[in-house]
Amino acid sequence: MIYQPLDPLLHAELRLAVMSLLISNVEAEFPYIKEQTGSTAGNLSVQIDKLSSAGYIKVKKTFKGKRPCTICRITSKGQKAFEAYVQALKSYLEVGDK
């Protein structure tokens, strides 16, 4: 097979955006991710839960003063999955080069 399968969990636009942010920042707070992705808080929360359930990110809920603070951090499993996704995507782009 010329094409490598794409991870369906990462193929969703918002989850891919979250992973892309975390791959370069390692960790980020929820408001930053929300701002950078242009997502609603509800949708982002659902997508973060899916990534967390898969073990791609870890979510830490703390407080900054009296305000809740959610921090997302990419895991080594998430890094490997993202790298595999990028390589699989390249297999689609390089077909014409062969």
Model-derived segments and spans:
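Amphipathic alpha-helical dimerization/coiled-coil segments
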Residues: 1-3, 20, 79-98
